Amino acid sequence: MSEDTRLMCGLTLILVPTIVYGGLTILGVLTSGSFGAPAPTGLSPLQVSLYRAGHAHAGVLAILSLFLQVAIDYAQIPTSLLWPARLSALAAALLVSGGFFAIAHAPALRPILYTGVGLLVAVTLLVGIGLLRSR
């Protein structure tokens, strides 16, 4: 494992407690506080769905970010794109999940979600093509 991969994987894993906290928040939302988690009041069904989507994407994209960090070591990617790829993998996880939470309360923040999706598409294509090109 390269030093850059170790650094980015470490940063990603440090963010996992925020996903755990989000899970506790979702538990409170879905159970109306009956499992000891605080129950927010006044959420619409759409907001609850966006909370669920944000939390689900956070976990899945954190795992994908970890995978991409390792895959970048094996992909044939131009040196000038290595760090942008590493940062985009982690940023996409943060922006997509954060975008769902943001638009639950402020629909005008929708570009956060779309920026994350754009980064996710770009980095997965870059790494995928780089892996196919490597020998």
Spans of features found by a protein language model:
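Polytopic transmembrane helical bundles with strong interfacial aromatic enrichment
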Residues: 1-55, 59-135
